[in-house]
Amino acid sequence: MNQSSLLAEFGEPITRVENALQALREGRGVLLLDDEDRENEGDIIYSVEHLTNAQMALMIRECSGIVCLCLTDEQANQLELPPMVVDNNSANQTAFTVTIEAKVGVTTGVSAADRVTTIKTAANPTAKPTDLARPGHVFPLRARKGGVLARRGHTEGTVDLMQMAGLQSAGVLCEVTNPDGTMAKAPEIVAFGKMHNMPVLTIEDMVMYRTEFDLKLA
C-alpha cells in the first residue's frame, strides 16, 4: 500500500496537517513521513517549548538515538554553529552543524534530562554561543530558507510545523526505528502513531497545505 492509502484513516491532507498543528500546540508529538521516493521514513517531532523528559526518553528508547534540534538559519547563526563538515556530500544534504551540550545544568549530557536541558538552552531566544559546549550529544540541524517548498526534508518540515502552529521555531526530531533496528517505514509509522496517539502526516501534505493557503514562513 502507498502512503495515501495507509494514511487515509488520519483524514485528508489538509485535515492531517491541522490535526498535527493542534497536537503540537497541546504539547504532543507528531509523526512526519517524507516522500516515498526519498527516504520514506518517519520522524517523531516535538516542539522545544513543550518538550519533556518523558518525551525525550521515548525518543531515545523507540528511535535511532540521534536526537536533532531543528533551527532556522537565524537561530543557528545566533549560536555561531558552523557546519559539521566543510564539504557536505551526503545524499540528502542534511545540514548538520557541530554537536552541542549545555554548559550549565548537565552532567554527562547523555541522559534524557540532560538532552532536554541542552535543547532548551540552545533554543532560548536570548541564548549566546558561550552558553554551549562543543561537541556534545545533541545534533543541531539548519533548516533551509523556504522550508518544505525549498527542500522536502524532515528538518524543514519540523521548523515549518512549529511556525504554522504559532510556536517557537525550534523543534526536535528523531527517526523512528523498528525493534530489530531497521528503519520504520510508512506501515510501521502508522501503527506507532495509533499506539502513542500521535497524528501522522507527510511532507507532501505540508507542501499542499502551504500552497493552498499561500503560507509565507520565515
Swiss-Prot record:
It is an enzyme of class 4 (lyase). Disulfide bonds: none annotated. This is 3,4-dihydroxy-2-butanone 4-phosphate synthase. The record marks 137, 175 as: Essential for catalytic activity. Catalyzes the conversion of D-ribulose 5-phosphate to formate and 3,4-dihydroxy-2-butanone 4-phosphate. GO terms for biological process: riboflavin biosynthetic process. One of its GO terms (molecular function) is 3,4-dihydroxy-2-butanone-4-phosphate synthase activity. Belongs to the DHBP synthase family. Its cofactor is Mg(2+); Mn(2+). InterPro entries: DHBP_synth_RibB-like_a/b_dom, DHBP_synthase_RibB.
